[in-house]
Curated annotation (Swiss-Prot):
EC number: 3.6.5.n1
Record's protein name: Elongation factor 4
Cysteine disulfide partners in this protein: none
Natural source organism: Campylobacter curvus (strain 525.92)
Reactions listed under catalytic activity: GTP + H2O = GDP + phosphate + H(+)
Gene Ontology CC terms: plasma membrane
């Protein structure tokens, strides 16, 4: 056991984490050069295309130093804010972490967020300055930044280039010498933390565990503490990026995959503890929170008869991603669908894309919302995720909305743009710190509702892509909020309702109806598009009717004949307007998402 090292890699997006992992795998000879593909740890196509890591992967490496054999378990972590939950549980399974920082970019917001998770778990952190082969690399400046912002001593920082392979051996040696061996006890009852689970078509639900005490052998009867169910261990494997390696036992301090032959991943929930049925441990592994969805959106199949297919697809995705939650809902405008909860916007995009790709569905997503707390006049408190659930105005005492604590790091020249953007989004500044004369760190409290739409895009475009952003949930605060409804031809379109601050309602309503006017197809009768708060209409646009030339067949003759035909047409249009229905195209829903 003293020769085991469990470590993970922490880095901001694009600082070269997956490439560094590839290099370590290659150096230890875990994968032959023929089988090596770039970003071998990123198994989903969508991960490789977007260049991000979504699911945490693991790999067991063998390394020899001074004639001794060591086992290095590399536990990969995603870098994006939405997946910080995956990060926290990956880090809970390690004793050490490599803090990878790009030698030309310096410290970014997510680097800081993940380092704090690592420090809370008391990990040994080794600073690694990557990409030293770049012409713009300035390792010394980056070391100073790490010391200033995070307060880590960088005298032992290791400079590497994952691309050329420089410094990789030195890094492996540092992992062995500086990361502590697992502190665990063979004699205690078995205790293992499930830090990932996924579904395999042949083997069923698999649990990736880190063993803290004791051991697990093939054919043992184990107890999953969260569900209190017993299962037989059918197989044990060590993780490997290409094909897992079978083993008869997994010992203390090790990382491995347990096959229990389960049909459902909810039986091996991430964060649960596995122990032996005959000698169970008293306490589960602590310090572990469930993922809570923050952003909710309605997802509907474009073809209404595909509802059951969508349910199956969500069930299957839930097997791999325990952080999504969903329940069926109906909309007058869109038919049957689901209200799905996500960790954030990127998570929502990725899930929607995976549903469309992997299950061949055509979907439409409504505007994302957050969970509001509504205090009613009778003292009852409602938690709502869908604007259409909001009670009548006269029953509402107040509406509270969730706030997030955000960290933004930006070059000083864009400071003005960012402060303007944050003030427009009702942000409250809590801290401002110059890391270097060129870069500044801002901390703001912002309503979650203001960042779920397009905040990230706006932030990037107002700083030419240089700012980095990270957030964590803070608390609920009272807000001056109203529900904005959109009516088309007098009927409220429930899927387009949103909750907005009263001060922005007027302008938001105007923008809404303008955008809708461009999209609603012209009918044979005129269509009014209105934005309303309660019964009060605050904005209106009209889509003009298409006219048929009813007088075309009259050649010359009496004017009264023409007038009679035009009057008849007018009557018909009136009748049509009273009973006519307008079918809204898909773009109508998407365009509303884009309105700032």
């Amino acid at each position: 056991m003293k020769n085991i090292r469990n470590f993970s890699i922490i880095a901001h997006i694009d600082h070269g984490k997956s490439t560094l992992a590839d290099r370590l795998i290659q150096e230890c000879g875990a994968v032959s050069s023929r089988e090596m593909s770039s970003q071998i740890m990123d198994t989903m196509d969508i991960e490789k295309e977007r260049g991000i890591t979504i699911k945490a992967q693991s790999v067991r490496l063998n390394y020899t130093l001074d004639g001794q054999n060591f086992v290095l378990n590399l536990i990969d972590t995603p870098g994006h804010v939405d997946f910080s939950y995956e990060v926290s549980r990956s880090l809970a399974s390690c004793e050490g972490a490599l803090l990878v920082v790009d030698a030309s970019q310096g410290v970014e917001a997510q680097t800081i967020a993940n380092v704090y998770i690592a420090l809370e778990n008391n990990l040994e952190i080794i600073p690694v300055i990557n990409k030293i082969d770049l012409p713009a690399a300035d390792p010394q400046r980056v070391k100073d930044e790490i010391e200033h912002v995070i307060g880590l001593d960088c005298s032992g920082a290791i400079e590497v280039s994952a691309k050329t392979g420089a410094g990789i051996n030195e890094l492996l040696e540092a992992i062995v010498r500086r990361v502590p061996a697992p502190d665990a006890n063979d004699a205690l009852p078995t205790k293992a933390l499930i830090y990932d689970s996924w579904f395999d078509n042949y083997l069923g639900a698999l649990a990736l565990v880190r063993i803290y005490d004791g051991e697990i052998k093939k054919n043992d009867e184990v107890l999953v503490m969260g569900t209190n169910k017993k299962h037989i261990v059918l197989d044990l494997m060590y993780p490997h990026p290409i094909a897992p390696i079978k083993t008869a036992r997994i010992g203390t301090g090790e990382v491995g995959i347990i096959v229990l032959g389960l049909k459902n991943v909810s039986d091996v929930q991430v964060g649960d503890t596995i122990t032996l049925a005959k000698n169970p441990t008293k306490e589960p592994v602590g310090g572990f929170e469930r993922a809570k969805p923050f952003v909710f959106a309605g997802i509907y199949p474009i073809e209404t008869d595909k509802f059951e297919d969508l349910r199956d697809a969500l069930d299957k995705l839930k097997l791999n991603d325990s952080s999504i939650s969903y329940e069926p809902e109906t909309s007058i405008a869109l038919g049957f669908g689901f209200r799905v909860g996500f960790l954030g916007l990127l998570h929502m995009e990725v899930i929607k894309e995976r549903l469309e790709r992997e299950f061949d569905l055509d979907l439409i997503a409504t505007a994302p919302t957050v969970t509001y707390e509504v205090v009613q006049t009778d003292g009852q408190i409602l938690r709502i995720q869908n604007p259409s659930q909001l009670p009548a105005v006269n029953k509402i005492e107040m509406i509270k909305e969730p706030y997030v604590r955000s960290t933004i790091i930006t070059p000083t020249e864009f400071l003005g743009n960012i402060i303007t953007l944050l003030n427009n989004r009702r942000g409250v500044q809590t801290k401002m710190d110059y890391i270097t004369p060129e870069r500044v760190l801002l901390e703001y409290d912002i309503p979650m509702n203001e960042i779920v739409m397009d905040f990230y895009d706006k932030l990037k475009s107002s700083t030419k892509g240089y700012a980095s952003f990270d957030y964590e949930p803070s608390d609920y605060r009272e807000g001056d909020l109203v529900k904005l409804d959109i009516k088309v031809a007098g009927e409220t379109v429930d899927a387009l309702s949103i909750i907005v601050p009263e001060s922005k309602a007027q302008s938001k309503g105007r923008d809404f109806v303008k955008a809708m006017k461009e999209i609603v197809p012209r009918q044979l009768f005129e269509v009014a598009i209105q934005a309303s708060i309660g019964n009060k209409i605050i904005a209106r646009e009209t889509v003009k009717s298409m006219g048929k030339n009813v007088t075309a067949k009259c050649y010359g003759g009496d004017i009264t004949r023409k007038r009679k035909l035009l009057e008849k047409q007018k009557e018909g249009k009136k009748r049509m307007k009273a009973i006519g229905k307008v079918n809204l195209p898909q773009e109508a829903f998407l365009s509303v998402l884009k309105i700032d």
